[in-house]
Amino acid sequence: MPAEKPSAQDRPGAPVGRRVVLGLLAAGAAGVLGGAQLQKGLEAVLGPIGIRDPTGLVGLLPVGNTFRFYSVTSGAPKRDASNYRLDITGLVDNKRTHTLADLQAMPQTNLVRDFQCVTGWRVPEVHWSGVRLSDLLDDAGVNSAATAVRFTSFDGTYSESLTLAQARRADVLVALEMIDGPVTHNHGGPVRLYVAPMYGYKSCKWLSGIELTSEVVPGYWEHRGYSIDGWVGQSNGRNDDPTS
């Protein structure tokens, strides 16, 4: 999801030039001083730039309560109703492969919750809609040996995990819609994970795989020092134990 503010060495892609960055910083300051209309214009421009910014500086711009778009790769391939697949594998009784149409036909749950990035920015009262992860797990049948769930992305790199108890929370969705329509590609669509009570790095974008495992498998950012349990307000997102 999104995947939150990777470092330059972890996120390949075409760099944003120094002049562009300086210009954006100036424009961001103007947006704060120039009112809501200019601010909206900046948000429209900065979103597409942010997804391929290896410097991370775009995430620091004062663009208001809006999403910043990050990817830990140079970008994910696009998927739509014709080629999207979600595989449920691992310690399950029945492996499943769901198309986008399959997921859309299932009972949908609506939530209005904030999205909090570990880097500090927040988008309040986002409208989310999708299939409860617990419903998908029940449909596949969870083996008694399973204690955790691992998620993979069709960007080919990103992964995340939850304990089985966390995954069964009513506010954890396999999201098909957010804000005011289908989840867009930049937001991690057509299907992404949304873990309401945790920082955004736990909400895997471009979701392609759900695997039941016997133990928690640390995800992309956990291998880079982030907490496995990314509860908003109970963790700063970083693992503070220097021995870990």
Residue ranges and their predicted role:
Residues 23-35:
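Hydrophobic membrane-insertion alpha-helices, especially the h-region
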